[in-house]
Amino acid sequence: MKQIEVVAAIIRKGDKIFASQRGYGDWKDWWEFPGGKMEAGETPEEALKREIREELSTEISVDKYLCTVEYDYPKFHLTMHCYICSLLTEALHLNEHEAAKWLTKNELENVRWLPADLKVIQELKCLKENANDGSRGDPC
C-alpha cells in the first residue's frame, strides 16, 4: 500500500481551533486541519510553516507536538504528525480550501471531518480545557 507522510497544524486562537474544508479531490467538502506533505530534507516544523504559507498566506509558530495519527485510507496509508500552532499574523487567505471556520471544542463535532482528522479531535478533547500550551488533562 502507498505510504504518505504529512503534517497538520492545529491552529489555536483563544478558545477556538481553525478548521478548513477541502475544495478538491476524493474528499471534497470534508473538513481537515490544514497542512500537507513533507518534502525531502524538511523537518515537520519546516513543512508546516511552508504548507501554511502556501495554503493560507499566513505565518505560524509551531508551539507543541500533539500526536501522530496512523490511518489506512482505501488507496494509501497516512502518517500524520500534528502540532499545536498559533498565528503570527492575523490575516488568512484560503488559497486551496473552499471554506474555513474557527470552532470551539464544543463545536468540533459540528462539521464532517476526514477520518484521520477525527483521531486528532479525540486528542484535542483530552487537552486541559483552558490550557493554551497543549498540556493534557486526564489521560485518554
Question: What spans do the regions from the language model cover?
Answer:
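Active-site-adjacent beta-strand/loop module that shapes the phosphate/pyrophosphate-binding cleft
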Residues: 59, 69-91, 99-101
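Charged phosphate-binding loop/patch that engages nucleotide di/tri-phosphates or the phosphate backbone
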Residues: 116-140
